[in-house]
Every structure is written in structure tokens, then in C-alpha cells.
Amino acid sequence: MSYQEQQCKQPCQPPPVCPPPKCPEPCSPSVCPEPCPPPKCPEPCPEPCPPPSFQQKCPPVQPPPPCQQKCPPKSK
């Protein structure tokens, strides 16, 4: 009879294996917030950098005005 009681205790022990899966769930969210924020910063940084480069190209367009001054005298 003692053997049968031991056999019943063996199948009952498997239930404790269920609690471990609960640990991976709370661990997953903690690992996502850490690696998620760093990659988001490097991507948005390179985009805002190109706009300033375009502003520098705008000043060189001012030189054309002097050429227009030479054009009016020719029309005279």
C-alpha cells in the first residue's frame, strides 16, 4: 500500500513545475524596456541631422542676386 501512496505523490509533484513558467512572463517585459529605448534614440537622431545640412545650402543661393544687377544695365 505504501508503494501506491508514493506513486500518487509522484504525479502530484509535477504541478510545482507550473510556477516556473510564470517567472518568464514578468522577465520578458523587463528585458524589452531596456533594449527598446536605446535603439529608438539612435534612429530619430540621424533624421534630424540632415535638415540642418539643407539650411547650409541655402546661403550659397544668395550669390545669384549680384548677377541680376548686371542684367538690368544690359537691358538699358
Curated annotation (Swiss-Prot):
The keyword Metal-binding appears for this protein: no
Gene: Sprr2f
Tissue localization of expression: Expressed in uterus.
Segments annotated as Sequence repeats: 21-29, 30-38, 39-47
Signals that turn on the gene: Up-regulated by estrogen in the uterus of ovariectomized animals, with strongly increased expression detected in luminal epithelial and stromal cells at 6 and 12 hours after hormone injection.
Protein role: Cross-linked envelope protein of keratinocytes. It is a keratinocyte protein that first appears in the cell cytosol, but ultimately becomes cross-linked to membrane proteins by transglutaminase. All that results in the formation of an insoluble envelope beneath the plasma membrane.
Gene Ontology BP terms: epidermis development; keratinization; keratinocyte differentiation; response to estradiol
Residue span of region Disordered: 53-76
Domain of life: Eukaryota
Protein name: Small proline-rich protein 2F
GO cellular component, one term: cytoplasm
Coiled coil feature spans: none
Stretches for region 3 X 9 AA approximate tandem repeats: 21-47
Bilayer-spanning residue ranges: none
Protein family per UniProt: Belongs to the cornifin (SPRR) family.
Entries under InterPro entries matching the protein: SPRR2
Keywords assigned: Cytoplasm, Keratinization, Repeat
Subcellular location as annotated: Cytoplasm
